[in-house]
Amino acid sequence: MRKKYRDKFTNPEIVKRIKQIENSPQMQSKLHSVKNGMKNNIINPFVIVIGAIFVFIALRAMLDIYSLLVMAAIVYFWNKYSKQRRNELAKSYIDNFLLAVLKEILPDTTIDYFKKIDLKVMKRLVPDSQYYFGNCHIVFGDDYKTEFSNMEAFTETEDSEGHTRQTIDFCGQVLMAKFDTKINGHIRVVPIKKGKVLGLRNHGNYGKKTKIEKGIETESIEFNNSYAIYSTDDFYTRLILDPKIIELLNDWKEKMRVCLYMNEQYISVSFESNAFLFALPQTKKQVDELSLSTEYEKVREKLSGFYSLIDIIGEKL
């Protein structure tokens, strides 16, 4: 019997408990101290601009090899200093806000802010992009070791004048759970964009049907108009994608584009939210606005939906 986790993210008592912890005098005192420390690591953009102008004027007056050496040294040490401040800011944010919340729900959760989920997972969800960037890699303390990451996928093209243009194909979140599905090959459920390309369904960079895949339709007209199923395993596709999964995916499409990829080893979902979650605060005002319960709400709905998906699939296998 597989353990189910969906209720952990729909239970109002957990939200209530997090707010109680946050509002306790001890936690308020701790958060006040933490926020003051984080503010010390915020670099004022105005100071950066003034400093850059001053250095430029001073070096321009010299215009010799020594000025170039000084400029190189300044850039090197400034980058090193900025990176150190950013790392300290990230550690404070992770330890005192993200982990403080997530460990209340799944105690063994870990976070590496400057890493991303496995590149293969990203490529299989958005296969027609060229480059992939991500951050905030979270490994949740559940039986599946569910992984989370922000993700951006983009392509680069060159115009007739030789100028490079970057196009963002996807911006949002990716979730992946290791799961022995018994699938022979893989199953892809990709969103359909409005309009057709050369008379064919437009999937954007989610990838069209390949030669080894078979297109499968469901009894839901709403689903068939919003998603395409491409699979190498007809039996498990029809077994897994039952009315509960269809309903769940239909609900998601009202909020954002969602893509599902499954193979014999894992289940993954991408949410095209057009924004990164858990961005580091850039100003002192943003630091003041940080809240345990607010950080939890940012990811709660996506985790609830993802664990619902896993629970339903687990019942079938």
What role is predicted for each listed range?
Residues 74-100:
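Transmembrane-cytosolic junction motif
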Residues 99, 103-155, 161-317:
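Charged, low-complexity intrinsically disordered regions
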